[in-house]
A protein has these predicted regions:
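C-terminal cap/substrate-recognition subdomain and adjoining C-terminal extension
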Residues: 25-33, 44, 49-51, 133-170, ...
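Bacterial N-terminal signal peptides that target proteins for export
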Residues: 1-8
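Short, flexible coil/linker elements and helix-boundary hinge sites characteristic
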Residues: 1, 20-23, 39-46, 80-84, ...
């Protein structure tokens, strides 16, 4: 058993070095660490399916696919809320007047006056009555054309290296599921591996009925558990995020899991995280990354637009 385990570790380490070439410095080491623990799990339980869980906005994509990205002076890219309103695919807002009403009045009032518990689900609900397939096709095309260039190169390299080595990758995001799922073709993952804020679909049309739990904070932990339980022999071996408030809970959950097969330890990676919340800092591998797949760069410290960007630090 020990010889077999050593062979698995050597195999995944060599594979990691090849796949992760060109990524930022931390990528190779993180992948090697995760695959070493995945090898321990497989050695102890050959039927086990190692799984890695990713946040999306700020973790895979630089910025926010829902709200867009600017540098205080220029719009670097418009988010899918903006683009769907422009395209006439939003059921509440349309045209320039609709854009102003949403970005300048309604969403800021919801987010700041009431709270994200109502504001974030509204981002998925305001497409009620729209054809799910039509909206899905539009969002996928936008991702291929615009957003994939803003994917962090290191995140994509790590995700692909893990997938190639047999670790299944899943995305859990507080963006609308239709938005985050648009990255499935760009990332080469099945659409079923994406979990965002969900609404029921009836007769091919989007409804306003939210599917709970909403994947934010502890809700991400609940969604992660549901996904693992639904995957025969699934084991959560890694988690990636960028925000202590929205991702901290599910990262800590993966890092502190007791009794993983083979004595494996879950790896939790905090990407570009700001000041750590109490009780989180000691559990995470903290890294900084900036390089994108398309070589996209910002002139200043960019941030999501104040009205449109829906995620907290």
């Amino acid at each position: 058993m020990k010889a077999r385990h050593l062979s698995l570790v050597l195999l995944v380490a060599v594979g990691c070095a090849a796949v992760c070439a060109g990524a930022e410095e931390h990528a190779d080491g993180i992948v090697a660490r995760i695959l070493e623990n995945a090898a321990k799990i497989k050695a102890a339980d050959p039927k086990a399916v190692p799984m890695a869980f990713w946040d999306f906005d700020g973790t895979i994509i630089k910025g926010d696919i829902t709200g867009g990205w600017d540098d205080d002076w220029n719009i670097l890219y418009k988010g899918l809320v903006h683009r769907t309103i422009e395209a006439g695919l939003n059921s509440v807002y349309s045209g320039e007047e609709g854009l102003k009403q949403f970005f300048d009045v309604d969403y800021p009032r919801l987010r700041r006056g009431i709270g994200k518990w109502l504001a974030w689900p509204f981002l998925a609900q305001m497409y009620f009555g729209q054809s799910e397939s039509e909206l899905d096709a539009f969002c996928r095309a936008e991702c291929e054309k615009v957003y994939r260039k803003w994917f962090y190169a290191s995140s994509v390299k790590m995700l692909h290296a893990l997938e190639k080595a047999g670790v299944e990758n899943y995305i859990i995001s507080a963006s609308p599921e239709l938005f985050v799922r648009s990255a499935c073709d760009s990332l080469g993952l099945p659409a079923a591996r994406f979990r965002g804020i969900r609404v029921h679909v009836a007769c091919g049309r989007i409804t306003t009925q939210i599917v709970y739990p909403v994947p934010d904070g502890e809700g991400k932990v609940e969604n992660l558990r549901d996904i693992v339980l639904a995957r025969p022999h699934g084991v959560a071996v890694a988690a990636f995020g960028n925000s202590y408030s929205t991702d901290g809970a599910f990262l800590r959950y993966v890092a502190k899991q007791p009794s993983l097969p083979g004595g494996a330890i879950g790896t939790a990676v905090m990407i570009n995280g700001r000041h750590p919340a109490e009780g989180y800092a000691e559990h995470f591998v903290k890294v900084s990354q900036d390089e994108t797949v398309g070589g996209m760069r910002t002139q200043t410290t960019a941030r999501p637009p104040s009205a449109a960007g829906h995620h907290d630090p």
